[in-house]
A protein has these predicted regions:
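Tandem repeat scaffolds
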Residues: 2-9, 15-164
Length: 164
């Protein structure tokens, strides 16, 4: 009887090993999943939301000031007129995102992905784009308005973009 019990426990253990929990399930519990959501005007300021998912969400006028969003996913999101002042967006995926009239002042955007994103009338004073993935046209556009030094990293916005 004891051997049968041990065999069952061993079998269950091996089955669990064969079907591990997906990495996204352990890294991103449900409270950090906001994809495909209407989040206009929501206040996320001063929150710690690393690896949160906001893909395909409308976050117009949302407040992410002083937010830790390291590794967050905003792909194909709408951040029109949103405020991300002093937010940490290191390693964030911000591709195909609309930043029209958004405020990225003093944000840390190190190694963030911005391909296909739009920056019409976006505030970037003091933002650190070090090693961020931007296309040439985005860099030209941002260099025209780049100014300031990031208060967290000490890097100038112009230097982080490689402006001449």
């Amino acid at each position: 009887m004891i051997k049968l019990g041990r065999s069952i426990i061993l079998t269950v253990f091996l089955v669990l090993l064969a079907f591990p929990v997906p990495s996204w399930a352990t890294k991103n519990p449900a409270h950090l999943f906001f994809s495909h959501s209407l989040l206009q005007g929501r206040d996320f300021s001063n929150q710690s939301l690393p690896a949160a998912e906001f893909a395909n969400s409308n976050m117009e006028l949302a407040n992410f000031d002083h937010c830790d969003l390291e590794g967050a996913i905003f792909s194909k999101g709408i951040l029109t007129k949103a405020s991300l002042k002093q937010a940490n967006l290191t390693y964030a995926m911000l591709d195909q995102t609309d930043f029209t009239e958004a405020d990225l002042s003093d944000a840390v955007l190190v190694e963030a992905l911005f391909l296909g994103s739009t920056f019409h009338h976006t505030k970037i004073e003091g933002a650190d784009f070090t090693d961020a993935l931007l296309d040439r046209e985005q860099i030209r556009q941002l260099c025209r308005i780049a100014s300031g030094i990031n208060s967290t990293t000490g890097i100038s916005t112009r230097d982080s973009l490689g402006c001449r």
